[in-house]
C-alpha cells in the first residue's frame, strides 16, 4: 500500500515537471518558464506543466491559433508569439488567459483576430500587435483593458479608428499607431483632436499620416486642416403623393425621410410588420415606381418602394403593412434614427376630437410639431398622435381641408375613404 502511495506521488511529480520535447521548461526569477522559441514549430505543442507562467513561442512557423490553444496553461502571465506566420486567431484561443499581463503578437500576418477574447484579459498591461495585416478594430475591442499601459498597433493596414476606441484604456501611457494608411476623412478628425490633447505618449507623430484622399496624402494627422463634418440628423414625415410614381389600385402610404449630414449619410429603412422584419438598404425603384434592374423583388412593383430621394411608398397599404417604420441614417460620425408606428383605424376612434382644425406629429428629438401649414409648434406630452384621412389612390371625391370644398391641406395622405391612419410618432 505504501509503495502504491509513493508511486502515485511520483506520477504526480512527473506530471508537474512534464515539458513538451522541443521546449525547455524551468524556473527563473520566480517564474515557471517554457521556452519554445526558434524550434520550427507549426503548432502549439501539448503537454505543458499547468503551473507555467511565461511561454515563448516566438520565431516559429505557427500559421494560426485555434480555440483552446492555451487551455493547458491557465496561469500564464506572459505569452510571446512574435515572428511567426499567424494569420488567424480564433475565438477562444486566448479567452482562458485571465492572468495574462504581457501579450506579444507582433510581426505576424494577422488579419483575422478574435477581438472578443480581449474582453477576458482584464489584467493585460502590454499588448503588441504591430507589424501585422489588421484593417479593422471594433470600437469596444479594448473595453476591459483598464490595466493596459502600452499598446502597439503601428505598421498595420488600419484606414480608420472608431471614436472612443481608446477611452476604456484609463492606465494607458504609451501608444504607437504610426505607419498605418489612414483615410483622412471626417471619421478620423476625432483622433487628431484626441492625440493633441491626451497625456499618453504617442511617438513618431509625423508618421501618423494620411494616405487618402490624394490631396492630403502624406499630411501628418497633427496638421490635418479643418474638414466640413457633421453627424447625421433625420426627420421622418409624411407626404401627400409621390410625383411620377405609377401606383396600382388600393391604399397608398407615403413616408419621407429627410436626412442631413456631412459626409452624406447612407439611408436605411427598417420595417417591422406582423410577418417579420424588412430591411431596405438602398433604393429599389425608379421614379416610375418600378423595380430597378438587379433588385431582388418578386414583381415589377415592390411592396415597399424606396426612392433615391428618401421617400418610401407602400402602394397597397392594409392590415398586413401595419407596424413600425424606421428611417436610419449613418455616416462616419455616427447615426440617427426616427420611427413611426402605423395602424389603420375606423372613424369614431377619436378622430374628429383629435383632428380639430389642426393636427400634430412629434418632430425628431421633440423639437416641435408639424401642423397642416408645416409650421413648427412647441411640442407637448399630448402631441403623440397624428390622425390622417385616407382615400383611394387617384383624385379625391371630397376635400377635407378646414371645410374648404375642393382643397386638400398640405401634408394629408390620400389613403382610403372613411378610414383613418394613426401615426404614433417616436424618434430615437
Swiss-Prot record:
Pinpoint the LRRCT domain residues.
Answer: 180-231
Q: What S-S linkages are listed for this chain?
A: 257-327
Where is the major localization of this protein? secreted
What's one GO-annotated cellular component? extracellular region
Which positions fall inside the LRRNT domain?
A: 19-50
Q: Where in the cell is it found?
A: Secreted
Q: What name appears for this protein in its UniProt entry?
A: Immunoglobulin superfamily containing leucine-rich repeat protein
Query: What organism does this protein naturally occur in?
Result: Pongo abelii
**Gene (UniProt):** ISLR
Amino acid at each position: 500500500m505504501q509503495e502504491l502511495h509513493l508511486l502515485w506521488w511520483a506520477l504526480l511529480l512527473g506530471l508537474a515537471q512534464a515539458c513538451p520535447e522541443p521546449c525547455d521548461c524551468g524556473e527563473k526569477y520566480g517564474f515557471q518558464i517554457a521556452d519554445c522559441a526558434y524550434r520550427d514549430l507549426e503548432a502549439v505543442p501539448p503537454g505543458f506543466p499547468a503551473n507555467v507562467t511565461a511561454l515563448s513561442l516566438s520565431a516559429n512557423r505557427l500559421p494560426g491559433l485555434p480555440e483552446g490553444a492555451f487551455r493547458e496553461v491557465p496561469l500564464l502571465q506572459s505569452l510571446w508569439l512574435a515572428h511567426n506566420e499567424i494569420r488567424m486567431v480564433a475565438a477562444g484561443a486566448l479567452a482562458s488567459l485571465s492572468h495574462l499581463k504581457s501579450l506579444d503578437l507582433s510581426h505576424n500576418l494577422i488579419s483575422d483576430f478574435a477581438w472578443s477574447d480581449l474582453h477576458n484579459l482584464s489584467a493585460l498591461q502590454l499588448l503588441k500587435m504591430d507589424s501585422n495585416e489588421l484593417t479593422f478594430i471594433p470600437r469596444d475591442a479594448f473595453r476591459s483593458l483598464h490595466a493596459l499601459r502600452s499598446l502597439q498597433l503601428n505598421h498595420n493596414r488600419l484606414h480608420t479608428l472608431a471614436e472612443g476606441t481608446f477611452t476604456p484604456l484609463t492606465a494607458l501611457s504609451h501608444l504607437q499607431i504610426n505607419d498605418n494608411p489612414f483615410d483622412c476623412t471626417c471619421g478620423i478628425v476625432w483622433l487628431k483632436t484626441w492625440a493633441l490633447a491626451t497625456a499618453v505618449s504617442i511617438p513618431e507623430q509625423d508618421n501618423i499620416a494620411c494616405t487618402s484622399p490624394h490631396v492630403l496624402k502624406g499630411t501628418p494627422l497633427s496638421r490635418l486642416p479643418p474638414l466640413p463634418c457633421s453627424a447625421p440628423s433625420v426627420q421622418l414625415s409624411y407626404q401627400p403623393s409621390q410625383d411620377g410614381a405609377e401606383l396600382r389600385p388600393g391604399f397608398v402610404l407615403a413616408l419621407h425621410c429627410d436626412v442631413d449630414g456631412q459626409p452624406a449619410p447612407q439611408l436605411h429603412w427598417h420595417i417591422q410588420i406582423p410577418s417579420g422584419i424588412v430591411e431596405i438598404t438602398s433604393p429599389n425603384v425608379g421614379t416610375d415606381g418600378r423595380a430597378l434592374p438587379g433588385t431582388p423583388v418578386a414583381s415589377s412593383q415592390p411592396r415597399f418602394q424606396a426612392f433615391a430621394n428618401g421617400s418610401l411608398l407602400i402602394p397597397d397599404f392594409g392590415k398586413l403593412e401595419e407596424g413600425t417604420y424606421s428611417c436610419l441614417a449613418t455616416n462616419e460620425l455616427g447615426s440617427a434614427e426616427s420611427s413611426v408606428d402605423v395602424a389603420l383605424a375606423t372613424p369614431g376612434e377619436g378622430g374628429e376630437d383629435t383632428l380639430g382644425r389642426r393636427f400634430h406629429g412629434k418632430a425628431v428629438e421633440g423639437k416641435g410639431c408639424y401642423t397642416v401649414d408645416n409650421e413648427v409648434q412647441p411640442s407637448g406630452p399630448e402631441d403623440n398622435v397624428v390622425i390622417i384621412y385616407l382615400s383611394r389612390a387617384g383624385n379625391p371625391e371630397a376635400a377635407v381641408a378646414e371645410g374648404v370644398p375642393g382643397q386638400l391641406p398640405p401634408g394629408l395622405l390620400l389613403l382610403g375613404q372613411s378610414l383613418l391612419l394613426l401615426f404614433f410618432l417616436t424618434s430615437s
